């Protein structure tokens, strides 16, 4: 009979009992048989279970005894220990619920089990399955509860720690795989499903926690929950998470208590977990968010704490919580609502660090739930931070916004795109740089999605390129110059593989929303690219020539090219060095590739050439990066012929996509072809079709055609009919472009086309068909074909003369209500333009006389209906405006032929009664001046509107004249710095020469007997206004130190000159010069001397002249009678000065005066002067002795090509004596004339060598020469200082100075000549002698002496009486030579007007003694 398993176990164990000391082999053999047999024993059936258990227990008792007898529970051998553990576990399984061992042995059994469990980490061990079986048995029998019953808490803790240490990720994966297998095989084999190792461990630990959960277990679990280590395969955190999820109810109070302690009593916690409680909260929120309901309010409070670091940590935790999938917190929305609200408030936290942390958290929240309820709030908060006052926060907000746009581009809010794009205009450079980087990445993704069909083109994303173009407007950052932005448009804006068609779709949409500033920026980038390509072509040509003939001239040219080329690179200095290095390399292959790129018109082919080239030179090449940039810049990388062809195909195609995009498409086409007309090559037929179909853009297209003519191959006969039709029937602007295109396209064989065109145009003109267009066509023909135009010139002129003589109809209404100009006046204007353009040819020279045209212009400018010229009373101003503009345009080439009268009439257009006419004239004038299209003398016109009562005209004029002065001054200084000579005629100050002459011939000049200072103040308003602007301290042009002396020189020269146009107006010139001098003295609040003040000045001979000495002496007396008293002049100036003060006060009250540059001058020409002068006006400036500083006579330069002639003479000038009075008395001036002979013994004398005089001349009377005014001043030598080699001189007027006589011009005075020299000091012939030799009271002299400062001395320089004539004949006046000789100016070709008489307040460079 076969034995039962229990009997076999009993026999085997009985044999084991008989052994006293069994060896390992026999022991292992027996135990293995026992273990295998025990696995076959099952528990008895439930019907008779108790009886069956007792029988089995009796049969297995030998096993129990043998284990105890041989102390197998404590055996250290691994094999024996494992087999004993298996046998014990099987005993517990078979006899359950009865215990097979007594309590005293249970602890050893627990220890044995734990020891075997620790070996479970060795998954490759052959015994792993046996140990896993033991674990499964322990789990199923809830054996761990027995450990708790036996008070083996330490063993339980040890087991917990051991489980956490041995569990691995693949254990849990095994569980997942088994669950999947269960689902698939549930019906096949549901009885034999085995629990995984992870699940068994989890069951054991869960049973323990459900039975007895305490804080010690919680600490172990939480430690493993947030455990971080190098072992990435550890599954301790997953095990802890599973425990918390399974035993949430039991662990919740303990965990909440622990977390609350971390919030409230963090220092009292002894475990390291106190620093990881945020991580614990986050992990629990993922698995059991309901456990944190009591903890969340504490976290909300942390967001409100004062510590920044605490707020940041709490914010990061809240962000991670809300970044979970939306289903995690769906059941607890209300509980977490307060936390979410406070989380959003942290986006506007007072700390920048907190706001930046909030932005990062907001990004993760949006990524987790882009369509959730919380997403909109997060996006709004992020958008608001784009306007944060801290640039770091704005940068972070920009990064987050761009990442969000890339993540969810299709549904991102449009406002967020716009706000992010605005960061390209941020005030911080760092923000703009980051915005450029991130937004180009966004735009690339957007272009890819549009190309793939996932998105449609939208204006919001197309704003990005527009905003990038605006970076060109930045003047304070080199990174955003056009040199860098060209590379952005070439390489970074579009994906590299994006097709040309897709790129053009985006460009067209961009042009649909671009404004003029965007276009200007794009044009600047393209023009720089074109400039580099042109310069590089020249340089490559020179490089090839240099191979054969490398001369110094070639090197100089190359250096010039390198400077120009390097200016197109981000770092110009570095690029210049690299160009020189490339030159030294002499690599012909590089030059050949660059030539290919310059000649290539296709961007696709250019990209292939560029990639092959860069691959050829290699990344390790020393110039790789430089050549990469250079190859990009010289290739058609932004636009190409392919872009042009694509545009033309879209515009000419029958299935035009969108008519609204037609206009921007044409605009884009014009921008490309205007910069690169060669790109039209290959698309000539499509362009011709477009030209025939688009009347609205015909003029621009024709301009492009004329530019592209040298680069394209066309049949002239195909284009001529279209252009001819435009010349006959088009608009005036189209006609202008059409004639230009005909000239460009017509070859040598087609030059006769202009003859045929002229015949057709004359027939159209005489028949009265489309006269404005016909006149424009004829004018343009005259510019491009002078010979053909000369054949019909007489016919055109006679027709236009008849137009001017025609009577306007009384009932004729204006055909253009906006301009208010009738047809008759319009026709006159068109006729003027036709004649004027014919004298400004683009090709060839005009041999016709211009006198007739200038005569018409003069008559038109004078008045209506003069000499047969008829105009409407209401619209004649438009004709006068056209005539004035015509004079301005003609002055480019015909300025020498423009008479002073025509010049004056043109200038007076600035004071026309029609404000619109005046404003239009000034705008045109300023444009021509800034472009250097006309002589600078016309700038004096601004002074008339500068003193206009119309506020708008005044403001415009002030802006215009400031712009002109600043630009002219910079250019004048540049010439001076480059040693190109210095001439006062180049200075903006020189405009006063022409202004004074215009005023002198003004019919409104006050009468000779007028002594009303208000009338003079109103009339001289233009002069006062321009002087005020010129003497502005903050003017970017000349400073006062330079301006005031130059003005003095001008007024002195005018005082010595006569009116060349009408000698009867000479007294007016002198009166204006007197007023101007006094105005400078009063307006100039700083007493200055300038080492650069010229002694002589050029005056235009067409306006000013000199007569002989005898005539001057005969006329001096009569001119003196016509002169104004000094006190009257001062009252005139003070009226103007009071107006400035009143104006400044009003500006301050209205908070309008922001700075000195914003000050505007009060209107003086109108009827708004309300000044009351009671009594007399005090002199605004004390007189001092004339400065004795010598100035160098500069180079003679002609003025604006004006014909100047020379006469040398000494003109006697009136002497004005100023006396000091009390404030309540009137200032009286006595006028006297003194004719001083040129041989006056005291005026000029030879210099003496007095280097060794020392104390020998103490007490003697001497006279010192002032080099500025040529005056000698008498005085007495009081003492001598041997250390400084200087003498103390007491002058007769009370001044005391220390003088080094070694460097001065002086003479001793004999007793006979003493009185004569004193008279000389009082009666000098120089103009403004009232300032050269002041006669003041002792008190005033004392006050003046106290105001003087110590300055350095300067060596005297001899001034020649006669200089070599300049290239252009000049009129100049010369003072007497130092030897007293005076030359007659009759036969001299060129002389100098000596203005050495200092009419300004003097300041000596010697040391003044109080």
From Swiss-Prot:
Region of interest (Disordered), residue spans: 1348-1410
Sequence ranges of the HEAT repeats: 3-40, 58-97, 104-141, 154-193, 196-234, 290-327, 334-371, 373-410, 411-448, 488-528, 588-625, 663-700, 714-751, 752-790, 848-885, 916-953, 1121-1154, 1155-1192
Motif (Nuclear localization signal 1): 543-550
Lineage top rank: taxon: Eukaryota
Subunit architecture: Interacts with the cohesin complex.
UniProt xrefs under PANTHER family: ANDROGEN INDUCED INHIBITOR OF PROLIFERATION AS3 / PDS5-RELATED, SISTER CHROMATID COHESION PROTEIN PDS5 HOMOLOG B
Name this protein carries in UniProt: Sister chromatid cohesion protein PDS5 homolog B
Gene this protein is translated from: PDS5B
